Amino acid sequence: MIVRTLEECRQSERRVVAENWESVRMLLKDDHMGFSFHITTIYANTQTHIHYRNHLESVYCMSGEGEIEVVGGKTYPIQPGTLYILDQHDEHYLRAFSSEMVMACVFNPPLTGHEIHDAEGVYPLDKSELISQCHKEK
């Protein structure tokens, strides 16, 4: 069994801070659950370009308001109680309005813990996941 508190994770290397957001990565690849679980805060009045080419993500808004705009598609409001699922590697813009948004996020494959979006909004794929994908394609 694994038991962790948000506060102890926040005070450790599991907290990753970027320009527009911070993420407390409570469950990671090395926990061997097959997914990772994060509490992510999107800072107020920000817009972040994201394109998870290598990961699927489900996001539940716990507090705050904003919107998600799918590139070339629709814009959806986000408020407490909203769940959105990026099941098509959707390129998108995530915007927080006048208050920060606090989100519970689940990633598959799981993150290792130190990922930050690259210039195209992508998290890199872990080397072992890349090898696994290559074997599946054969």
From Swiss-Prot:
- Per the record, what are the reactions this protein catalyses? (2S)-4-acetamido-2-aminobutanoate = L-ectoine + H2O
Q: Name one GO biological process term.
A: ectoine biosynthetic process
Name the source's superkingdom: Bacteria
Keywords (alphabetical) are: Lyase
- Leader sequence range is none
A Pfam family per the record: Ectoine_synth
Major enzyme class: lyase
Q: Does the keyword Amino-acid biosynthesis apply?
A: no
InterPro entries assigned to the protein according to its UniProt record, in alphabetical order: Ectoine_synth, RmlC-like_jellyroll, RmlC_Cupin_sf
The coiled-coil segments of this chain are none
Pathway annotation from the record: Amine and polyamine biosynthesis; ectoine biosynthesis; L-ectoine from L-aspartate 4-semialdehyde: step 3/3
Which Gene3D superfamilies does this one have? Jelly Rolls
- Tell me its EC number(s), please: 4.2.1.108
The molecular function GO annotations come to: ectoine synthase activity
Q: Return the PANTHER family for the record.
A: L-ECTOINE SYNTHASE, PTHR39289
Q: Tell me its family.
A: Belongs to the ectoine synthase family.
UniProt xrefs under NCBIfam families: PRK13290.1 (NF009806)
Q: What does this protein do?
A: Catalyzes the circularization of gamma-N-acetyl-alpha,gamma-diaminobutyric acid (ADABA) to ectoine (1,4,5,6-tetrahydro-2-methyl-4-pyrimidine carboxylic acid), which is an excellent osmoprotectant.
Q: What's the protein here called?
A: L-ectoine synthase
- Source species: Vibrio cholerae serotype O1 (strain ATCC 39315 / El Tor Inaba N16961)
